[in-house]
Amino acid sequence: MKTRQNKDSMSMRSGRKKEAPGPREELRSRGRASPGGVSTSSSDGKAEKSRQTAKKARVEEASTPKVNKQGRSEEISESESEETNAPKKTKTEQELPRPQSPSDLDSLDGRSLNDDGSSDPRDIDQDNRSTSPSIYSPGSVENDSDSSSGLSQGPARPYHPPPLFPPSPQPPDSTPRQPEASFEPHPSVTPTGYHAPMEPPTSRMFQAPPGAPPPHPQLYPGGTGGVLSGPPMGPKGGGAASSVGGPNGGKQHPPPTTPISVSSSGASGAPPTKPPTTPVGGGNLPSAPPPANFPHVTPNLPPPPALRPLNNASASPPGLGAQPLPGHLPSPHAMGQGMGGLPPGPEKGPTLAPSPHSLPPASSSAPAPPMRFPYSSSSSSSAAASSSSSSSSSSASPFPASQALPSYPHSFPPPTSLSVSNQPPKYTQPSLPSQAVWSQGPPPPPPYGRLLANSNAHPGPFPPSTGAQSTAHPPVSTHHHHHQQQQQQQQQQQQQQQQQQQHHGNSGPPPPGAFPHPLEGGSSHHAHPYAMSPSLGSLRPYPPGPAHLPPPHSQVSYSQAGPNGPPVSSSSNSSSSTSQGSYPCSHPSPSQGPQGAPYPFPPVPTVTTSSATLSTVIATVASSPAGYKTASPPGPPPYGKRAPSPGAYKTATPPGYKPGSPPSFRTGTPPGYRGTSPPAGPGTFKPGSPTVGPGPLPPAGPSGLPSLPPPPAAPASGPPLSATQIKQEPAEEYETPESPVPPARSPSPPPKVVDVPSHASQSARFNKHLDRGFNSCARSDLYFVPLEGSKLAKKRADLVEKVRREAEQRAREEKEREREREREKEREREKERELERSVKLAQEGRAPVECPSLGPVPHRPPFEPGSAVATVPPYLGPDTPALRTLSEYARPHVMSPGNRNHPFYVPLGAVDPGLLGYNVPALYSSDPAAREREREARERDLRDRLKPGFEVKPSELEPLHGVPGPGLDPFPRHGGLALQPGPPGLHPFPFHPSLGPLERERLALAAGPALRPDMSYAERLAAERQHAERVAALGNDPLARLQMLNVTPHHHQHSHIHSHLHLHQQDAIHAASASVHPLIDPLASGSHLTRIPYPAGTLPNPLLPHPLHENEVLRHQLFAAPYRDLPASLSAPMSAAHQLQAMHAQSAELQRLALEQQQWLHAHHPLHSVPLPAQEDYYSHLKKESDKPL
């Protein structure tokens, strides 16, 4: 990455037009091959070489990303637009322009760069980016993101999840342009311009951050990824545009500075680091927020200073990684594409820094840093990816992104200052998400706050996030910082060194501690400890007081930035690391060198962690960006946190960053790297912060830090390529883990990405991915490609084939299992359907019965007035007698009514035309009395026909039931019919009122004697009703069947028992009425009821509890209205008797009931038919038993 940065810087220095370099950068960032083009200057050439390699890998990755980027840009734009209509529009506009083409973007950026010299350019940039500043901001951001995305995509592509990506496009747009502008201007601007603008931006940024934080929070609340973006957008809406424009302009201006800074950073590592830091801080934040999403953009523009930071922080937080990246990304794009361009932006940014533009430039610039760091970009990308993943990814992914990133930092510096203030928040946020965390960090940062400080932690978990964000941020910040950082750098450096030492020693540990995220940042943090410390110190306070702390943190961060910058970058890189591990390595070295030894080594380990973390972070960011974003709302605190994060980030980054493992870093470090950059930013920013104000500067610091890492990023970039190329060999990815290399590398010059074939053997060709001068690591610096036809190639092919076959086999087995499961499920469903059908049939009968009751009785309707009708058709009583019987058993009273709505079902059964008619009329509210009489006659007929022997009893029963019995019997059986007719006067209503009680009694009957009296009568009623219903429901078939079953098998017994029972029942009823047969009747009745319930539910309880018992209750009530009254007297005795004889009575009574029912059914077809068939045997059996007991 560093190389890339150098190239960018060089290009910028050369004065190569941002456009030329920008496009190349962009290409590179996009992963295109034209690294040569990029490297106009020797530095550029060198970087280009590295980039080429990286680009190659990236191109593979990024070529797609590029398309993705553009497509995504639109996509993102859309998504962002979704997030914010206005911002989206802006973004879209920008995006569209950006997506138009890298060249276009570069061109725009170039223009911006050219304009870079003045704050106008920034505005122009804005204009370029979008018609309106607001739009421009989004566009810028988005475009940047897009470019960045393209750039990032290569390495960061992994990071740039589509979700994230959407924001990414935005940044890419901006980025492409920015890089251009950044590129040329960068050289032009040089750190000086950069610094100057940077500082104002810083202060501005700081100012903005306070405001921004609210937006930030808003953003955070607004949207996770987009939230941050969104809200910031609102506040930043105009500002965002401005910011974006500013970033663009800023990019143009700052880029020169930053590029130089970056160059320095890239080349020197230390100076560049610092400047990047500042840009990162400022740019990062601003950039990030606007970039993140729509908000990215918007915030990028006008609000950049305040909002952007917020946005960065807030936007970034949500999509911080992504968003900041987007913001950064734009910058990164500018950075990567127009690293030079971006620098100008930053310069401009610095110039504009005072104004919101400053921030935007930072934002723009931010992309540059990501660009600067390919990995950084990646990281940024990651961050962006996380928040604005695609942006981030784009930016980071492509090597160019890396360049852009560097540029970005430069470009971003101006915004960075703004961004910085924001960025600190962002950092804070990033802290959390690392890349997105910077932005996102804030939310988590609160808790993360320290972690934030541990931004690295962020980087760790969110290396990508942090990286992206940090990178993006850092880049932005870096930009700013580059700018500011250069100015600040001296001061910052001093500060940084002091703080570094402080933080290193002080914060270092705290950051790790603070930064649970240390995981990536942990080491990074540790490495960063000193760096982190400053950051942390600041950071920590920052977390406590996001607004205030951020500045301090920023400062601290900044302080560390120099030392930390790389680490942060490392972290970022680490994030990106995966993609561009080598970048971090490279960058870290430079950053490290300048930054300070402290973080370099520790960061390296962290970087490794970062790398892993990066992935984690990326994942986290991707998943957690939202959360982070949400957390982000605490923008201000997050800011503080973020600021700390940068520090931590830096801290963490440096380790990953460490020269030890360029490739590793590339994978692992790049995120860290990015982180580093941001830390540098913070470091630088810190000085700026003090200068501008603690708040903004610290943020800038973090941003700046990222910038720092970006320079290393360039070298790292090479490794990223390697990483990309690593595709061929996973070993390359191991580069990320290479912590040993970082230590070894720390003394060695920063690695340059050369990607030249170094050795060819019979079986493989070795390519030197990194050139570390005298220090070289075969594992991290070389990768080999097996030659076709070699044993190794064959082995690998066989292995691949084997794996593929195994996978296919597994897939097949899985499919088989799945099919099996499906079949089982289907079978289960079938069973369930069957069950439901049977239940429905039973219920339908039951419900319908109730319905009938409802029909006649107003109260009933609640039950299921329409159900009866509906039930009937479904249930063809005679068709499924067995099922019905079962269902009825389940449904106590439904037994008979359960047999299809009796009223309706009866017609189906049509056994008892009269009964059915009667039932139906009852249902239809026929004259109860008439129905009753009709039914009594019918029942008598049925009974006579069914059971001559029993006939008498039924007749008696009818008389007994007389009003309740006969009328009620059939009617209750028929549902409402019985109710109305049975208890025409009393029963209908009494039943209803007593329905609950009756039911309860029925339940109690099963449960206890207390309710049994009613139960017994109710039972009888239910039984009778069921009989009648059954007869009706079953119709001839059921009736005949029941008769056959009942009569034939146990007819005599049944009839005898039934007669006995009936007599008893009648007696009981009479007794109940007259309180005569309390015991016997209750028993008989109770048993009857119980029996009925048994037949119905096979258990009295089921019957009683069943809802249908309402029907039954009605029946019972109908029957029992009088009975109930009687049972009242019988209640006690019956209760006792029933309870005592419950078991006995139940079985005996069940039998009797069954017999009775059967006889009754015979008498009253409805009941008889359904329950009897199945129940018949059971009942006969029970009957025999009951006969003995009874």
Swiss-Prot record:
GO terms for cellular component: anchoring junction; cytoplasm; nuclear matrix; nucleoplasm; nucleus; perinuclear region of cytoplasm. Residues 879-894 are annotated as: Required for interaction with FAT1. Phosphorylated in vitro by MAPK8/JNK1 on Ser-739. Mutant ATN1 sequences with expanded poly-Gln (polyQ) traits are more slowly phosphorylated. Proteolytically cleaved, probably in the nucleus, to produce two C-terminal fragments of 140 kDa (F1) and 125 kDa (F2) each containing poly-Gln (polyQ) tracts. F2 is produced by cleavage by caspases and is exported into the cytoplasm. In vitro, cleavage increases with an increase in the number of polyQ tracts. C-terminal proteolytic products appear to be the cause of cell toxicity. In vitro cleavage at Asp-109. Residues 1049-1065 are annotated as: HX repeat. Pfam families: Atrophin-1. Residues 517-567 are annotated as: Involved in binding BAIAP2. Residues 158-174, 541-553, 693-718, 739-752 have a biased composition (Pro residues). GO terms for molecular function: protein domain specific binding; transcription coactivator activity; transcription corepressor activity. The keyword Heme does not apply. A motif (Nuclear export signal) lies at residues 1033-1041. The modification Asymmetric dimethylarginine is found at R1115. The modification Phosphoserine is found at S34, S77, S79, S101, S103, S107, S632, S661, S739, S746, S748, S896. GO terms for biological process: cell killing; cell migration; central nervous system development; determination of adult lifespan; maintenance of cell polarity; male gonad development; multicellular organism growth; negative regulation of transcription by RNA polymerase II. The record marks D109, G110 as: Cleavage. There is a cross-link at K1183 (Glycyl lysine isopeptide (Lys-Gly) (interchain with G-Cter in SUMO2)). Residues 17-29, 45-63, 108-128, 795-839 have a biased composition (Basic and acidic residues). It is found in: Nucleus; Cytoplasm, Perinuclear region; Cell junction. Residues 129-152, 417-438 have a biased composition (Polar residues). Residues 259-271, 350-366, 376-397, 485-507, 569-586, 622-632 have a biased composition (Low complexity). A motif (Nuclear localization signal) lies at residues 16-32. The modification N6-acetyllysine is found at K641. The HX repeat motif is a specific pH-dependent interaction motif for ions and/or proteins or other biomolecules. This motif could be involved in the control of embryonic development. Interacts with NR2E1; the interaction represses the transcriptional activity of NR2E1. Interacts (via its N-terminus) with FAT1 (via a C-terminal domain). Interacts with BAIAP2, WWP1, WWP2, WWP3 and RERE. Interacts (via its N-terminus) with MTG8; the interaction enhances transcriptional repression of MTG8. Interacts with PQBP1. It is linked to Dentatorubral-pallidoluysian atrophy: Autosomal dominant neurodegenerative disorder characterized by a loss of neurons in the dentate nucleus, rubrum, glogus pallidus and Luys'body. Clinical features are myoclonus epilepsy, dementia, and cerebellar ataxia. Onset of the disease occurs usually in the second decade of life and death in the fourth. This is Atrophin-1. It comes from Homo sapiens (Human).
